[in-house]
């Protein structure tokens, strides 16, 4: 069963807040945000796939990946990790790039703060996304970000539920 996803948009602050609780330990959810082979399993909303090109998960490191569509179309992105607090939070900047990793002008960029909190139900994930302007946020939402990110989080939930031991 899919748990609820909170998805709040604040036009005045050009921010989006996302929250979801997973029936899994913080360590397990953390791994699915920080290990390339696990990210590739859920980051892209089906029928798209995520393909990691490079990953260096450390402060000032980065993750370059391609979203690969059903017709093999490819869209590239880069995540630069700013601050990382093990099993607690990740601060990162996300940009659209060309195949070589160069930022695409005119495309929205996002600053993310991802939080992982142990709760009775498992792990509460919070994601705060900050945009430079309302126009950038509106453009991102117009590209289907809300539906795509929600589908990805539900795919992650399916994966985590399959790993949970049956009692």
Where are these regions (language model features)?
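Hydrophobic pocket/interface hotspot
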Residues: 29, 39, 63-65, 81, ...
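Intrinsic-disorder/low-complexity, polar/charged segments enriched in Ser/Thr/Lys/Arg/Asp/Glu/Gln
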Residues: 13-19, 26, 62, 76, ...
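Beta-strand/loop substructures that line and gate deep hydrophobic ligand-binding cavities in soluble
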Residues: 93, 100-147
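Generic C-terminal helix-cap and adjacent flexible tail
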Residues: 158-167
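Hydrophobic/aromatic beta-strand elements that line small-molecule binding cavities or substrate pockets
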Residues: 20, 52-55, 77-83, 109-118
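A short, structured loop/turn motif at beta-sheet edges
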Residues: 26-27, 56-58, 82-89, 115-124
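Short beta-edge strand/loop motif at the mouth of beta-sheet-based domains
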Residues: 17, 37-76, 167
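Hydrophobic ligand-binding cavity/cleft-lining segments
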Residues: 1-49
